[in-house]
């Protein structure tokens, strides 16, 4: 609320009026009527089309193999399709951002954190919006409060929403297992148990597939955004973990302001990459 988010604590009865399928033994909920959801593929393609209209060139299937430097200033990148020259480079490489940072001698503590998800068969109208159990964010921001080692290891919790086609997307896990993107029966069972705990009606719904992706994890749960002290022209925009799609527009806006104007309209200091460089030094 202090940040201007429209959110309130509601009772269990009020929560079930919004989502009638909820279990009868919940204590209450946090509710944000202005929350929304997007299709990440359509959004990404929309960003790409908008960028092209503004003159951007998008080079796909092109790996950056090194960064061209002149003293402490970046001047371009070496890639598998030749060299590209620019006085400004933004490292927005997600779970692979630490590798790109290493190319300029930076040790950024970004690691891949696997998330496993499940997709159900299409069913009738089941719910509106997105629901997350409290553990979903506790595991991200306050893992020290989790006492069960198995829960902590897999980070199994609940995030659920219904797609336009009627299927449910149910997550998920938060696993620090490197770049492994395989699904595991143990994790799927843990997710399903959590889902049925909050939505008993799901016990008879069929699962049609499962998949996994990687989120860019940081030790303090905050993204790494902004200029890097001592490196002219090098900027970070990574480490958003599971919030990358939601925070992409504001990240791009504020970072563009910092690059072009030297100052952003909302301070990026809490997210500065320099917080980790200072700790490392």
What residue ranges belong to the model's regions?
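Dinucleotide-binding Rossmann-like beta1-alpha1 core, especially the glycine-rich loop
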Residues: 1-14, 18, 157, 195
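C-terminal lid/capping helical subdomain adjacent to the catalytic/cofactor pocket in oxidative enzymes
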Residues: 9, 14, 56, 222-224, ...
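Short loop/edge segments at beta-strand edges and connector loops
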Residues: 11, 60-62, 209
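Mobile beta-alpha loop/short-helix "lid" or hinge segments that flank ligand
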Residues: 12-24, 125, 163, 168
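Helical element adjacent to the flavin cofactor pocket in flavoenzyme catalytic cores
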Residues: 30-88
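Active-site catalytic microenvironments for nucleophilic, acid-base chemistry
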Residues: 50-54, 99, 103, 258-262
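Active-site substrate-recognition segment that forms the wall
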Residues: 66-68, 73, 83-88, 93-229
